[in-house]
Amino acid sequence: MKKTIKMLMSSLLVAVGLAACGSNSSSSSTNAANRLTMTTFGELTTLDSADYDDVPSSDMMGQIFEGLYRVAANNKVELGMAAQEPKVSEDGLVYTFTLRDAKWSDGSAVKAQDFVFTYRKLVNPQEGHVAQSADVFKNAKKIRSGELPVEELGVKALDDKTLEITLENPAPYLPKLLTG
């Protein structure tokens, strides 16, 4: 009897193993290249990169948006949307970035003005959430307190591919701050 049970169990394990190795011939590759499936441990509250305060939304945005820099697998900061390291003024206050070519999901080009829009939204007191971490940008603190309009933020699009960031004070940690 024991020998029969062992044979049945061995046969079952082999059958399950072979079934797991097989392919699903009914699956379709239609739009498979255009779809990303991810699991989160909680409900997403937003996909607005300037208006989140929960971990699931933050994790998801880290997967779908990219900053001027990104954190590599070795936990080191590397270029993201920046095509090359920025030109930095002698006083360490002005950073000029050239953006690499990239497109939004609708096919339109990512432009420097998109970054300006996002950074302005981050410090705009009328948007609800205001990021104190953006206080490194020129005038950010005064904008957050309502003393200046968001247009005075030290972030400017010089053209479609060139972004200029002016700081209040030198910030050697700026690349880490500008990760997606």
Q: What kind of region is each of these model predictions?
A:
Residues Q84-V130:
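Aromatic- and charge-enriched surface segment that lines or borders ligand/interaction sites
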Residues Q132-G180:
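Surface-exposed binding/hinge segments that line
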Residues Y69, A73, W104, R120-G128, ...:
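Sec-exported extracytoplasmic/periplasmic mature domains
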Residues G17-A20:
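C-terminal motif of bacterial Sec signal peptides marking the signal peptidase cleavage site
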Residues G22-S25:
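Bacterial signal peptide processing site
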Residues T45, G62, E66, L93, ...:
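Solvent-exposed, polar/charged alpha-helical surfaces in well-ordered, non-transmembrane soluble domains
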Residues T39-E90:
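N-terminal lobe/hinge region of extracytoplasmic solute-binding protein
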Residues M1-M9:
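Bacterial N-terminal signal peptides that target proteins for export
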